[in-house]
């Protein structure tokens, strides 16, 4: 999404990870460090799961707060859908972000306490006053510039005009949280 916080600031506020086998297929295709086990620590660092933060596959101290509706909070239509799915043989799935789960149940949402916990709120707001961070409106990253394997800069387009360049002095991925692998592949070519 073209908003501060990217796609995490849009749509239905669903905070759902990909299937472990999808990440594992990336690693098997040669993307070292992208297996589910490799990424799990980052998933955990990213979240404060208000329902399952005590589980080994969830976090309890990350910047993005996640929750699920309790069954008693579901509206009539949701309860009917849940009952129909269970009657059709689908397993109860209280945590869709748990490894190897399928079934029907409430989705994890990033809207705890009535706030949409986007990457802008969870990551950028606490860092806005840092001298090494610049947030620019109407700016799109077109390419990540490398010196060997180290990202050193960004080629950007501002207000639809290409050609700007920004120097990277901090470590870490200069990509949004959503669509990152695909974006990294496109930007690093």
Stretches with model-predicted labels:
Residues 5, 20-21, 59-62, 183:
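Surface-exposed beta-strand-to-loop junctions
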